[in-house]
Amino acid sequence: MTSINEQLTQKFQDALVKSFGEEFKDVDPQVNLARDLRHGDYQANIALPLAKKLGKNPREIAQIIINNLSLNTICENPTIGGPGFINLKLKSSYLETQLKSLYQNQRLGIEKVHNADKVIVDFSSPNIAKEMHVGHLRSTIIGDCIARTLEFLGYEVLRLNHVGDWGTQFGMLITYLKEVYPDALTQADVLEIGDLVNFYKQAKKRFDEDPKFQEAAREAVVKLQSGDEESRKAWQLLCDQSRREFQKIYDRLDVKLIERGESFYNPYLNDVIKALDEQGILEKDQGAQCVFLEGFTNKSGDPLPLIVQKSDGGYNYATTDLAALKYRIQEDKAKRIIYVTDAGQSNHFAQVFQVAKKANFLPDTVDVTHVPFGLVKGEDGKKLKTRSGETVKLKDLLDEAVNYARKDLENRLQAEDRKESEDFINHVAETVGISAVKYADLSQNRISDYIFSYDKMLALQGNTAPYMLYAYARIQSISREGNIDYENLGENIQILLKEDTEIELGKYLLQLNETIKEVEKSLLPNRLCDYLYELSKKFNRFYENCPVLKSDEPVKTSRLLLCDLTARTLKLGLSLLGISVLERM
């Protein structure tokens, strides 16, 4: 189903050809939603840039375009505003027809893209032997939302988890565990993940303070890298232990990922160095192999190179990222690769992408994008920490959100003198708690830092998950009272728009298509959150001003259909955010 914007754009392009000739057929008519609804629903701004090109008055150009526009079935007569804006007001009859088509479409009018490319979304990426913390929250849920949106639009999406499963930390950990807990290197599940994290901290302390231990750890890394059977088995056990803990978090967040850690690319690292050398872009700097790039300098203004091989011959993150990028293009055949990491890595990825272009790993036909995000801060405005100053564990954060949601629900049940089963309370608390954490994050512009507040994210008013979930549950309650079988209405449906608030709701329901396409393009989930919040508010205004259950037919059924269409839109939008709806709260 073609969006309103696409329909209007096509009509304007036809009018431009009629008005000024075939050479104008691909000119963008600049059709957008009107900012001031007093002037109409949509606005075309093409007359202004065209007037400059043709050397005529913009209002004169606008009138010529209007004379050749064929919009009788879609809009009232177009008007010219200001210096030459073309204002368009949609007809109620057109809106009613569009809403009927939307209602009868299982995908709410959103078509899948044709000949969809393969897309890789690289997100989450925790480190082995460490617990997932609040820093992993944003990457995990932003990446999941982007992947869900692209999958819904028909793209083949490979969701990759680039876990940190290689490096000197394993030499430290294996060496330390051999001394204090050797069973952990030969038997599964003898350690809790928290114990493993503590052992890692102690190993790091020893590494920093004890030269002999440092040497032993380095030897352990060499043994691991050379494929020593005992070392590999110990490494595998440590990885498996962490994986199981990660999976518990992913299951709770309903996030699907395919693990392909740093170690996967080890066989390809030497080939990366060879390729860079063959291209003649490697330079030695203090014993390290580097690539110097334009536009990258340190604080002193000196050139800042990307180091791809350390002076001791070892590789680093840049080497692994280049190998991964090369593999994803050449082996996975990806045409679009999206990296979801914190904004602190923006410079790193800009360098990696530029080196990949210089080395001919990255052709112009492949789009690579770094999707940066800001910090999660506490209510004191500082980076979110525990009272003891440690990074907040993601598991603890989710548990606390669910506990808050449970208390809120129990207080509400008591106030309403309502009894519910323990299963109901557990399900609602878990759903609301996890949804609140997700929505609070996704509703912010990802580029910004945001303040983490349980009270704000669990509020039943405002741009929050509980508000959205309550709006959906309320509509389901209305539908149950309306006693209507939506599935068996067939072709005999009619949506009537009479009152201002139902016209506004109808118009807004038709903007979902454009919103999802905007998220596809901008990779900003907050655009979808803003749409859903505004939709909920418009529905509430409609319900307050337009009787539904007490109306006579055919208005009653029409308004129930608008209720159901709103519920379906909320459900779809929330599902793209990774949030499940509740039939009752």
UniProtKB/Swiss-Prot annotation:
Cellular-component GO terms for this entry: cytoplasm
Top-level lineage group: Bacteria
InterPro entries: aa-tRNA-synth_I_CS, Arg-tRNA-ligase, Arg-tRNA-synth_N, Arg-tRNA-synth_N_sf, ArgRS_core, DALR_anticod-bd, Rossmann-like_a/b/a_fold, tRNAsynth_Ia_anticodon-bd
Catalyses which reaction(s): tRNA(Arg) + L-arginine + ATP = L-arginyl-tRNA(Arg) + AMP + diphosphate
EC number(s) on file: 6.1.1.19
Motif segment ('HIGH' region): 126-136
GO biological process terms on file: arginyl-tRNA aminoacylation
CDD domains: Anticodon_Ia_Arg, ArgRS_core
Key words of the record: Aminoacyl-tRNA synthetase, ATP-binding, Cytoplasm, Ligase, Nucleotide-binding, Protein biosynthesis
Entry keyword annotation includes Glycosyltransferase: no
Primary location recorded for the protein, binned into one broad class: cytoplasm
Pfam families (UniProt xref): Arg_tRNA_synt_N, DALR_1, tRNA-synt_1d
Molecular function via GO: arginine-tRNA ligase activity; ATP binding
Cellular localisation: Cytoplasm
UniProt similarity note: Belongs to the class-I aminoacyl-tRNA synthetase family.
Quaternary structure, from the entry: Monomer.
HAMAP family per UniProt: Arg_tRNA_synth
Cross-referenced PANTHER family: ARGININE--TRNA LIGASE, CYTOPLASMIC (PTHR11956:SF5), ARGINYL-TRNA SYNTHETASE (PTHR11956)
Name of this chain's protein: Arginine--tRNA ligase
Biological source species: Crocosphaera subtropica (strain ATCC 51142 / BH68)
Upper classification of the organism: Bacteria, Bacillati, Cyanobacteriota, Cyanophyceae, Oscillatoriophycideae
